[in-house]
């Protein structure tokens, strides 16, 4: 068994798929995974793959041409999951895709296709949740800017940003992914862009969560006022609003700090 390993970014995953396909070893004899690799398995050869933009672009063109735009979006969402087995899930989906074309998207009876849809749905659901759960703090540093921190399981910044770009087109805002040291920056009335933050920038921007904002007290007051003690149902609340979303929500801060 040959195990191809790569970084969890999209270009690396697509390059890894290109190398596995080009090896001609056969799908039964290869496995793909992202790094870092945990425990090494006996009788496996591990092959690290460096990202190559030309090879990644070649895979992208093949997907769009032979399977279609919907399949490319599915592949993109799976890659954004940042699961260690994401490259392998995409690779096995593409085995069917390059054989059956656009019909592959309707072959949910095949485990490889169903698994790809399942992972992409998890990523989409998390992105949609952040549409509702993101909270902005108003920061004044020469000019007003709205700043929000999130800690998503998947890399959903590029999926969340278009929603707020449409809702807040004339505002300066930032959404920071604390887990990946990435940020989406939206200048007022201009397109947003994705940037990687330096350690100094991360440290400075982390202070925004400790600033005082009167709207935070309004959120907390609203949250307390609408609660009915006799109908308190924490289990139901956790179902609709899982705990890992609450770290950056002001209405839950006093409960998390106590």
Task: Label every model-predicted segment.
Residues 13-23, 92-96, 159-166, 217-224:
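Short, hydrophobic/amphipathic alpha-helical patches that form generic packing surfaces
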Residues 33-131, 135:
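Charged, alpha-helical interface segments at or near domain boundaries
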Residues 46-55, 190-204:
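Acidic, Ser/Thr-rich peripheral helices and adjacent loops at domain boundaries
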